[in-house]
């Protein structure tokens, strides 16, 4: 509904300041409605999947989001070129409403009760207080914020970088963004399965650390390479590799957050996601400021460094074993 209203607003408002205020209001309300999506999905995975398959499931869910993001570049671009940006939002919102109706009809009405809920669980206020005393929560939130800083730079400034800095034609830039996002989605799916495999082979702590450090570290390396090559194809290939490796860690973040949270896994996932959104908010605003001082290469390299450092925080994160509730006491 809010997507449709975004397009409708463009028809009824012409003053730029009124349009800005309207967009802030509509998108803010959309954000409130969308906020439970990722934490809720991770909560459902934790309730319904065995521990050895949770990262795989979380990776597949987040990969689905990236497929949608990837299709926006050529899809919305074509709609805007063919119709208008207002109609693009109306059509996209209509498709989303139709899918929501189908989901409502086909999805199960309820979920099985999670296995770890007992009659002697502590009071809600005690669990929340104990959760926020966990160093694991703060460590994973900081790491996710640093990861999101790099990720959101690519989301919001990649088109500008291709079109204005590299002077790539619009249609080529859109398809480059499509393939880069598809690569990231593939990385999420592969990373989720790789996380479960690594945990089985190396143990939960070591396995997840290996995936997180490898994914964020290699993503930073290929991001650095992308700004040091010249051809359009080479830049696209390096950014695709960078985002594929970066995407590998999405499943391990969400799976670990719900493990840390225990009975408060929804809150833990939401808190981590808030930290990620803080990093994602700072990045699009700060990047052009940094680019004025260091150039776009410098701004991207700094984001790569932030993500790389964020990967090392995983050395401080200890994953609880299955059935162990860190905040039950």
Task: Kindly give the residue locations of the regions a language model identified.
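Extracytoplasmic gate region of multi-pass secondary transporters
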Residues: 134-189, 247-250, 254, 258
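C-terminal transmembrane helical hairpin of 12-TM major facilitator-type secondary transporters
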Residues: 205-253
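Intracellular juxtamembrane helix-capping segments at the cytosolic ends
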Residues: 36-49, 247-261
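Flexible cytoplasmic inter-helical loops of multi-pass small-molecule transporters
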Residues: 104-127, 323-329
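Hydrophobic core of transmembrane alpha-helices in multi-pass small-molecule transporters
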Residues: 2-5, 18-36, 233-248
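Helix-loop-helix hairpin linking two adjacent transmembrane segments in secondary transporters
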Residues: 61-111
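C-terminal ends and interior cores of transmembrane alpha-helices
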Residues: 1-17, 217-230
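Cytoplasmic helix-loop-helix junction between adjacent transmembrane helices
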Residues: 24-66
